[in-house]
């Protein structure tokens, strides 16, 4: 709609007239942007085996075509993604260890929420939304080789990604308002704790057995953090055999410990509050 955003309605098409008298018409727009990326890294060696390391990345983006789908124009402000990490490393003949603290954020994420009129569940209106997310974290990554042929990879990550400025609302044709405020809530589908355990053993130089154990802590299934999925393990295992220079064989077993769990979101529950969760 030219200048006046309205929700979809029966018979919606170019030239149609909404209940408030707004005529549906194409809205023309034209933008020309340059996205940039910067990276810097530094390492300081205290000894031959121990030192400090840090890196920083700064990316910029702009909205893509899908962000212009709602009736309202999206926020076209620059999207910035700063990532900074700093920590220590230690290497010798049997261990390679890195432990880093990190910070990452993303500003001006564009999204669309379908808000429902509390007096008429068939009256649904799309609301454009621009919000930020950020997290601090800690990651420790190690590869241990205690004896010949055996490798053990360990990865631990703690993070706490949260929404910032996650607020929007709409006014329906009957004057009723509906809105959402999820500022400070944990980002959906992202676990706070990640663990990877990856042992492997070379029986011979051509025959290797391996396994992988991955843990994902509790993840929230809706924006209001009313629903969540419990933490879960994923397991994999396999064998790799280099028969000769022309032939390699491998076999993989998935979920060999018969672990159960779920991930993702719950359709239709995006706006359910903790107080109203069943």
Where are the regions a protein language model picked out?
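Short, intrinsically disordered, charge-balanced linker/junction segments flanking boundaries
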Residues: 1-3, 40, 48, 66-71, ...
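Gram-negative outer-membrane beta-barrel transporters
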Residues: 2-10, 14, 30-32, 41-61, ...
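A subset of solvent-exposed loop/turn segments in beta-rich extracellular surface proteins, enriched
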Residues: 2-21, 115, 268-277
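Extracellular loop and loop/strand-boundary signature of outer-membrane beta-barrel proteins
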Residues: 19-29, 69-76, 83, 123-129, ...
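Hydrophobic, lipid-facing positions within transmembrane beta-strands of outer-membrane proteins
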Residues: 36-40, 82-86, 136-140, 193-197, ...
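Short acidic, glycine/proline-rich loop/turn micro-motifs
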Residues: 65-70, 111-113, 165-168, 221-225, ...
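Outer-membrane beta-barrel domain signature, strongest for Gram-negative TonB-dependent receptors
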Residues: 83-100
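C-terminal beta-signal and adjacent terminal beta-strands/loops
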Residues: 112, 217-220, 240-278
């Amino acid at each position: 709609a030219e200048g006046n955003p309205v929700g979809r309605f029966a018979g919606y098409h170019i030239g149609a007239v909404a209940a408030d008298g707004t005529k549906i018409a194409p809205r023309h727009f034209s933008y020309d942007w340059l996205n940039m990326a910067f990276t810097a890294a530094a390492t300081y060696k205290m000894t031959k085996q121990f030192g400090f390391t840090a890196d920083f990345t700064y990316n910029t983006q702009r909205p893509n075509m899908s962000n212009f789908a709602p009736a309202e124009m999206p926020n076209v402000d620059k999207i910035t993604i700063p990532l900074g990490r700093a920590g220590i490393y230690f290497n010798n003949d049997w261990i390679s260890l890195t432990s880093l603290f990190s910070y990452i954020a993303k500003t001006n994420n564009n999204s669309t929420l379908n808000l429902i009129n509390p007096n008429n569940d068939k009256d649904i209106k799309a609301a454009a939304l621009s919000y930020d997310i950020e997290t601090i974290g800690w990651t420790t990554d190690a590869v241990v080789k205690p004896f010949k042929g055996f490798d053990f990879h360990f990865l631990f990550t703690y993070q706490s990604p949260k929404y910032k400025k996650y607020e929007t609302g709409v006014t329906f044709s009957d004057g009723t308002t509906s809105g959402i405020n999820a500022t400070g809530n944990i980002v959906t589908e992202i676990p706070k704790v990640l663990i990877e355990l990856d042992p492997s053993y070379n029986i011979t130089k051509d025959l290797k057995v391996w396994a992988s154990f991955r843990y994902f802590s509790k993840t929230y299934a809706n924006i209001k953090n009313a629903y969540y999925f419990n933490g879960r393990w994923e397991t994999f295992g396999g064998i790799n055999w280099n028969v000769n220079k022309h032939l390699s064989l491998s076999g993989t077993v998935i979920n060999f410990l018969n672990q159960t769990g779920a991930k993702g979101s719950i359709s239709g529950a995006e706006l359910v509050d903790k107080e109203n969760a069943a």
